[in-house]
């Protein structure tokens, strides 16, 4: 019997983009329904289950805004834009006044005087295929009227930080978001002269980066191998950091984030949480999930709350790969969730399994569909739900609620919240 007043640890397991819709290829099931997930099902069977609107009903969440809500922050109040978060996660300093962008290494062709995007991810190029060399060349050979830093991140992703005064994040994206469309001219979205100046600088960066990348040895070799060259950079998601109350100050708990994706690591760093690193945690499909689980358990030894994220499920959704998504979910269940459960005492820990958003394979992008949530601890209320998926979760005792309330629900179960009233 557990003694009241003994605070529990909290572990939040996030399958990035794991929720979905019915898929004809899977006989009308969602990938979660089609997948063999004994460990996730155990959490549902022995815990409390429900549906979560990551932000609120009808709002399509980004991974960034959704993770902020999971950690107890209202993104409408603290979201700085994706650029600064990606930069922090990639290990790039973002100072007051800097403007940061998330970027893609992409493939473009010259057509009628325009750069037309033919692959937004350059064949999903990654760090092992030369993106550090491409970034190094950009930093050495591109000249701009302001100081800047460009750095490769996970896979086809990168970050650009413009430094100095007279800059603004009030600018549009260069990314057309679709193949077959020309790279967009970045434009100011306000009357601030700093916005017009920033837009001009970003357009200059895109042009000059293309000139140094189009004949780069890395890209010549990719073309020789029949792979799309990473010859253009697509900046988007401009933002500037503002001061945010640290997680430990807001909730009186120490926290850690275990993730491979730069974005998720950046959120942890912005909130002052610890972000342990390990070269086996790549943020790609080849990440070592057992090592990620071990890292999370190690972090749980000396932190009150640990959030662990697996991003490859989301990538399969974006790629429209139903079978691949089932495979990633099963791997997550076996290697991540299973390993975590082997090292956790439910008397001492509150475990939450959820997704940050839905990425239906039929859509290839995030949607506002609610996601399943299971909360497992020794004295959790048990409902009739025995399987962890989007449909079964609707019958759970947690009902349907906003992600903005999730952390307080977990804190209550962990005896880490004060009573309201007498």
From Swiss-Prot:
Pfam families: Metalloenzyme, PhosphMutase. GO terms for molecular function: metal ion binding; phosphoglycerate mutase activity. Gene3D superfamilies: Alkaline Phosphatase, subunit A (3.40.720.10), Metalloenzyme domain (3.30.70.2130). GO terms for biological process: glycolytic process. It comes from the Archaea. It catalyses: (2R)-2-phosphoglycerate = (2R)-3-phosphoglycerate. This is 2,3-bisphosphoglycerate-independent phosphoglycerate mutase. It comes from Methanopyrus kandleri (strain AV19 / DSM 6324 / JCM 9639 / NBRC 100938). The lineage of its organism: Archaea, Methanobacteriati, Methanobacteriota, Methanomada group, Methanopyri.
